Amino acid sequence: MNKEYITAEMLMERNNMQPHVENGSFVEKHYKADPAERAASGLIYYYVAPEEITEFHRIDCDEYWCFTAGTPLSIWIIDENGVLSRTKFGITEDCEPVVYFKKGVIFASKSLSKDEGTFLSCITVPRFSPAGFELFGREEMISKFPETESFYE
């Protein structure tokens, strides 16, 4: 039997994704219809293009990233004590296929490929709220956390 695997780029195109403020592209897939209430959870599909970074940011909910297709990402996490950790996200031997971000941590990612992007699902608990989103610029990150300078190289 001939199995053809779908690429991250094909999934991005199939889902009519839009640019995200932190970089990458996304489409919201699950949400509660009543905007007056914050749903217990939310789901987006997210795509990171080759050589792209997603900017450091913090959200007011827990988040899980589940790898779907493409190439691994390098994920940088700064915990509530200001300690930086890094992990590889993907499905190769040295990667994690699911990554958990605790509410309030600062995190970012960058593509490890020049040729292929990464497609993933992001699950938030509770649902993501724009009011709980904080984006950090390069200069601010390097000033507060000098070890992040190499992220931008």
Please annotate each region the language model reported.
Residues 2-100, 106-109, 114-116, 122-153:
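Non-catalytic, conserved peripheral segments adjacent to functional cores
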